[in-house]
């Protein structure tokens, strides 16, 4: 009888020990999952802060300008096919950043241009600007072009995402306003969209390389993936700052390879 009781106690002891081990393992697993969630949340919040920092209005600083990053927005919704043709539209917005040799912004200017045409509802949503806000803040196209002409310098390299498209729209507007910009056609050029194509990270159904958007190139160069989404911002400012940020990465790569 005593032997039987001892055996039962031994079995109970083993069961209690096994249960304790299992509970400890479950607590450790819960703690690991919680730590992982905290780590992921911290990483996500860090990425959000980084994106917000890159898309925040830069503070003016002194320095020697080496790059002029340019962006234009049209009054009409233009698809990819039209962007590759000679199609032109009055400018809705014109913006630029002057950057130093390392890509740090020295000065940013961005303007909405007052035009007589109407934008479609789809375009208003894309550009993140209501008609009321546009009419209240827009300036004369000639005034914006004049301000651009004042920052053009022979030592600058002209940079844009789809640079040929932006130049075509800009030169068409300059001709309409009779404000010559002869120097801009003489500057060295750097098209970020073409550089993104050569990287080959965006592929079509046939696995051929495709042109990335300004956001896709920005996310690729900064290893961001498709999330989190970009914060709300006027498209003209967003694309300008995305392009400037992408250029900074490319310049840092070039410096490290020297």
Task: Give names to the regions the model predicted.
Residues 65, 87-94, 98-127, 152-257:
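Metal-dependent phosphoesterase core characteristic of DEDDh/y 3'-5' exonuclease domains
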Residues 2-24:
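N-terminal signal-anchor transmembrane alpha helix of single-pass membrane proteins
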Residues 126-145:
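Metal-dependent phosphoesterase signature
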Residues 21-27, 251, 255:
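Juxtamembrane transmembrane-helix termini
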């Amino acid at each position: 009888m005593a032997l039987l009781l001892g055996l039962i106690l031994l079995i109970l002891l083993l069961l209690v020990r096994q249960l304790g081990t299992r509970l400890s393992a479950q607590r450790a697993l819960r703690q690991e999952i919680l730590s992982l969630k905290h780590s992921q949340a911290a990483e996500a919040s860090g990425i959000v802060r980084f994106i917000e920092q890159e898309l925040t209005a830069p503070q003016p600083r002194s320095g020697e300008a080496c790059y002029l990053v340019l962006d234009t927005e049209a009054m009409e919704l233009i698809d990819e096919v039209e962007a590759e043709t000679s199609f032109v539209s009055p400018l809705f917005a014109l913006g630029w950043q002057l950057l130093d040799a390392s890509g740090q912004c020295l000065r940013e200017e961005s303007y909405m241009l007052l035009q007589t045409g109407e934008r479609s509802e789809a375009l208003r949503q894309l550009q993140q600007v209501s008609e009321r806000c546009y009419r209240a803040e827009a300036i004369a196209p000639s005034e914006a072009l004049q301000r651009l002409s004042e920052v053009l310098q022979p030592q600058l390299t002209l940079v844009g995402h789809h640079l040929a498209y932006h130049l075509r729209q800009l030169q068409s507007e300059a001709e309409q306003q009779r404000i010559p910009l002869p120097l801009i056609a003489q500057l060295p050029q750097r098209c970020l969209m073409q550089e993104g194509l050569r990287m080959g990270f965006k592929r079509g159904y046939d696995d051929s390389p495709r042109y990335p958007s300004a956001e896709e190139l920005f996310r690729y160069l900064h290893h961001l993936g498709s999330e989190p989404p970009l914060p709300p911002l006027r498209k003209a400012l967003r694309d300008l700052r995305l392009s400037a940020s992408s250029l900074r990465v490319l310049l840092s790569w070039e410096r490290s390879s020297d």
